[in-house]
C-alpha cells in the first residue's frame, strides 16, 4: 500500500521557494511552540507534531535531500509501481532502479560502469575564505601589519558544533531502526532484487538528534565578524597568496577550520615603475640644466626625498643609480633606485634667447640656419 506523503513545506509553514534562512526561522519558532514539555495536557499530540517538525527540517535544511524531495516527493522511501495504459510501468522501473541502486539498470547486468560510492556524513574541513588587501610601496620596504575585518562561520558556542540542542541527546533513527542501513527488496520485470544502502536520514550512524540546536538550527556553525592583523612580508609581488591556517570557516561535524587566503594587491605608485627589487623614476630637466649641471629632488619609496646631482654636460636618457634605495629582495638586501634623466628641448624661443644662442653657436663654430 502506498504511503501517504508528507508536505514538509506545509508542516513548517513556509512556501516552496523559501530560503534556508526562512526555513531555519520557521523551525526555531515551531520547536519552541510544540515542545512536548509545553503541552503536558496533550503530550502525545505534541510529540507527534514535534517529530514531524524535526523530520521536515532535516529534509528541507539539506540541499541534496530537499532537491530529491522537490523532485520525487520523498526522501529515502520509494514509491510503488502501477501499470498504466501509456506504458509508464517500465519507465518507472528503469527510473526508480537508478534511484535505488545509484546505477543505470544496464550497467548492473552488463557491467559498463563501477558502482558509485554511497554518500556518508563525516567530519569535513571548513571552507577557505579569500580576502584581498591593498598595500603601498612603502609597506613593501620593511613589511607591514594590516588590520582586516571579515565574516566567517565559527563553531556554535551553544552546541559546540554538534548541531544538537544541549541535553537533548540522540534517538534511534526511525527510518533505519538504528542500524544505519536501509534494506530494500524489489520484484520487477527482471526478477527479485535485494539491495542495502546507507540510511540518508542519519548518514549511516543510526542516530538522529532529538532536537536541533536553537542557535545554529542544526548546522553547528554561526556567522561572526572577525578582526585580525595580517603580517605582510617585505617586497611581496602583486597577486601573492598568503595562507593563514585556521583563519577560514569552521568545519562540519567536528572537522577542522579552513584557511584564510590573503591575496595581496600592490597599489600602483604613479612616481615609480617596479622592476624586481629595483624602482625606476623618470625626471625631466631643461636643456640648459643638462648643459650647465643642476641638482634635482628625487622621492623615496618609504617617504621623504633625496637630492641627486646632475653634472654639467649630462646627455639625454642618462641613467643614474642610487644604491640601496629600492625594495628589499628575498634575502633582505635592498635594490636600487634608478633615475632616468630626460632632457627637454624647447620648441620655440624668444627673440632674446635666439640671439644669445646664435652668438654662442658662432663662438663654437657651429653652423646654424
Swiss-Prot record:
Domain J, first and last residues per copy: 7-73
Cofactor: Zn(2+)
Source domain of life: Bacteria
Compartments where located: Cytoplasm
SUPFAM superfamilies: Chaperone J-domain, DnaJ/Hsp40 cysteine-rich domain, HSP40/DnaJ peptide-binding domain
GO cellular component: cytoplasm
UniProt key word Repeat: yes
Cofactor binding note of this UniProt entry: Binds 2 Zn(2+) ions per monomer.
CXXCXGXG motif repeats: 156-163, 173-180, 199-206, 213-220
Signal peptide: none
NCBIfam families linked to this entry: DnaJ_bact (TIGR02349), PRK10767.1 (NF008035), PRK14282.1 (NF010875)
Protein family according to the UniProt entry: Belongs to the DnaJ family.
Its biological purpose: Participates actively in the response to hyperosmotic and heat shock by preventing the aggregation of stress-denatured proteins and by disaggregating proteins, also in an autonomous, DnaK-independent fashion. Unfolded proteins bind initially to DnaJ; upon interaction with the DnaJ-bound protein, DnaK hydrolyzes its bound ATP, resulting in the formation of a stable complex. GrpE releases ADP from DnaK; ATP binding to DnaK triggers the release of the substrate protein, thus completing the reaction cycle.
Protein name as annotated: Chaperone protein DnaJ
Organism name: Thermotoga maritima (strain ATCC 43589 / DSM 3109 / JCM 10099 / NBRC 100826 / MSB8)
